[in-house]
A protein has these predicted regions:
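Anion (oxyanion) recognition and catalysis
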Residues: 106-109, 113
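Active-site-adjacent "subsite" loops/lids of carbohydrate-active enzymes
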Residues: 26-28, 32-34, 38-50, 110, ...
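Hydrophobic h-region of N-terminal signal peptides that target proteins for export
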Residues: 8-17
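Glycine-rich, proline-tolerant flexible connector loops at the mouths of alpha/beta enzymes
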Residues: 69-94
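Sec-dependent signal peptide recognition
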Residues: 1-7
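Extracellular/periplasmic catalytic domains that process cell-envelope and extracellular macromolecules
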Residues: 22-27, 60-61, 113-114
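Conserved, mostly hydrophobic/aromatic
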Residues: 30, 59, 67, 112, ...
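Catalytic domains of carbohydrate-active enzymes, especially glycoside hydrolases
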Residues: 50-77
């Protein structure tokens, strides 16, 4: 009798677990495209767009449906901002707008949406300067509000 009761309890638990599970309509299959690895430095806007187009095409072929695009690495921006300077990872010099002008984030939004992909902007919220950055733009927070940063071993970090 105990064995029969145990089997009934076990089977009822399995059926309840199966009934509670509802598969998701869609999975998040994302890829991160970063700017800090130097892959864009020295590129013209046209070359950067070609590189990004190739990356998006390959990722789409592999079933990626979301892109996480790094747009703020060191309190600088890969998009038009009234607050943050242009990123050195875009032009090679922080604070310098791309020539010819283009907005990488806006361009990525358009390209991802053409492919039916989501796009998410990735920011580094506290990193203000790495050791590799030697010049800061005049409107960089470490120059305009130095009191909001602390320095450690050549790095600047925003003080939350």
């Amino acid at each position: 009798m105990r064995i029969l009761l145990s089997i009934i309890l076990l089977l009822s638990g399995l059926f309840q677990a199966e009934a509670a599970y509802k598969p998701h309509k869609r999975e998040f299959r994302g890829a991160w495209i970063q700017c800090v690895n130097g892959q864009f430095q020295g590129m013209s806007p046209t070359d950067m767009q070609k590189t990004l187009t190739r990356q998006l095409d390959i990722l789409q072929q592999y079933g990626t449906n979301a892109i996480i695009f790094q747009v703020r690495a060191e309190c600088d921006a890969l998009y038009k901002s009234d607050i943050e300077p242009w990123s050195k990872y875009l032009t090679g010099r922080q604070g310098q707008a791309p020539t010819p002008y283009w907005d990488p984030l806006q361009w990525m939004v358009e390209q991802c949406h053409k492919r039916g992909m989501e796009i998410h902007a990735w920011i580094n919220p506290y990193r203000a300067k790495t050791k590799g950055t030697t010049e800061l733009a005049a409107n960089h927070i470490a120059r305009t509000h130095r009191e909001r940063c602390f320095e450690y071993d050549g790095l600047y970090v925003l003080n939350p």
